[in-house]
């Protein structure tokens, strides 16, 4: 009996009925377990979500999406055998791998986001607790014009950290009221001034979310831990999962002794970035955001700065 052989058509490689380029074609919400090894420390285990894209030329109906999964899995296997690794380098390697697999594409993009658990101790009693920080990384690879085997890779690393802010405006109103009340009770002016310097006045608070991302060329590394520290210390106070009464006193007092507008937080982050990363190239792209969830309003307060590192250095060091 003679067997028939069928050649399955490559539908993706056929020509589309409407011949236009597509900027991004790929997969989103791809869940992967990522283990990042660290020097002399326990590895970080992350449940990560990936978005993976390539561009598509006008003469091709579709992309080979299975290659996206192959590219991610191959790089994740490589990570397991590497002693030290960064999540932005993971995205960079995946983007590079994608262009190698999608010969028809000129650029590839990878986005990754995870929840990163960090250990914290409460400020007074030292109770250990875990805090969640949202971290994210991105990478883009562009094929060279004259050399198809050359890929220009850019990578981005960032974090979003929750903290606390205290409103300076309402605090000044309450400070003025306290001064007037004390004066009516017969307290002398010098005593009132000393009292107000030692005891912070009431104000309304916000739960703030500070966000920093730094985009650099593939051969520069940016410390994620440094980004997290910068965001934390740029608000009025850190927040903690577990607090005893003495801890609450420290947190509330710290925040109200250090009141900040949403704009102050962004400027503080910018200043700390310049101080923390003296070797970062001038063409690094810095994005800083602060979102404060108001307690006495229905709206949120927002501030942002997007700049090159060189621009921030010039403004802050002038």
UniProtKB/Swiss-Prot annotation:
What cofactor does this one take? Fe(2+)
UniProt site (May be catalytically important): 167
Part of which pathway? Answer: Cofactor biosynthesis; 5,6,7,8-tetrahydromethanopterin biosynthesis
Q: One GO biological process from the UniProt record? A: tetrahydromethanopterin biosynthetic process
Q: A GO molecular-function term, please? A: GTP cyclohydrolase I activity
Cofactor remark from the record: Binds 1 Fe(2+) ion per subunit.
The residue stretches assigned to a coiled coil in this entry are none
User: Pfam families, alphabetically?
Assistant: GCHY-1 (PF02649)
Reaction(s) the record says it catalyses: GTP + H2O = 7,8-dihydroneopterin 2',3'-cyclic phosphate + formate + diphosphate + H(+)
Keywords from UniProt, A to Z, are: Hydrolase, Iron, Metal-binding
EC numbers on record = 3.5.4.39
Recorded superkingdom: Archaea
Known HAMAP family for this protein?
Answer: GTP_cyclohydrol_A
Q: What does this protein do?
A: Converts GTP to 7,8-dihydro-D-neopterin 2',3'-cyclic phosphate, the first intermediate in the biosynthesis of coenzyme methanopterin.
Subunit arrangement? Homodimer.
Q: Which family does it belong to?
A: Belongs to the GTP cyclohydrolase IV family.
Q: What is the name attached to this protein's record?
A: GTP cyclohydrolase MptA
Q: Which organism is it from?
A: Methanosarcina acetivorans (strain ATCC 35395 / DSM 2834 / JCM 12185 / C2A)
Lineage, please? Archaea, Methanobacteriati, Methanobacteriota, Stenosarchaea group, Methanomicrobia
């Amino acid at each position: 009996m003679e067997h028939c052989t069928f050649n399955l058509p490559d539908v993706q490689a056929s020509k589309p009925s409407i011949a236009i380029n597509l900027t991004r074609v790929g997969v989103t919400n791809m869940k992967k377990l990522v283990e990042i090894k660290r020097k002399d420390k326990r590895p970080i285990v992350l449940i990560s979500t990936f978005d993976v894209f390539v561009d598509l030329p006008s003469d091709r109906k579709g992309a080979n999406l299975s290659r996206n999964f192959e590219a991610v899995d191959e790089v994740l296997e490589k990570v397991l055998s590497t002693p030290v690794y960064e999540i932005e380098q993971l995205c960079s390697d995946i983007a590079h791998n994608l262009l190698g697999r999608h010969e028809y594409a000129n650029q590839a993009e990878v986005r990754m986001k995870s929840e990163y658990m960090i250990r914290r101790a409460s400020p007074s009693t030292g109770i250990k607790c875990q805090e969640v920080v949202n971290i994210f990384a991105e990478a883009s690879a562009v094929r060279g014009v004259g050399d198809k085997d050359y890929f220009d890779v850019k990578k981005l690393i960032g974090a979003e950290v929750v903290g606390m802010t205290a409103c300076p405006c309402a605090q000044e109103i309450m400070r003025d009221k306290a001064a007037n009340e004390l004066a009516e009770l017969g307290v002398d002016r010098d005593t009132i001034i000393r009292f107000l310097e030692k005891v912070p006045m009431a104000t309304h608070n916000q739960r703030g979310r500070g966000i920093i991302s730094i985009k650099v060329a593939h051969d520069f590394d940016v410390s994620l831990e440094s980004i997290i520290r910068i965001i934390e210390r740029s608000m009025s106070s850190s927040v903690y999962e577990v607090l005893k009464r003495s801890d609450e006193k420290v947190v509330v007092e710290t925040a109200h002794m250090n009141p900040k507008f949403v704009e102050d937080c962004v400027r503080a982050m910018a200043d700390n970035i310049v101080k923390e990363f003296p070797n970062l190239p001038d063409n690094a792209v810095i994005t800083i955001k602060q979102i404060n969830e108001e307690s006495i309003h229905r709206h949120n307060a927002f501030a942002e700065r997007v700049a090159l590192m060189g621009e921030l250095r010039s403004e802050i060091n002038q």
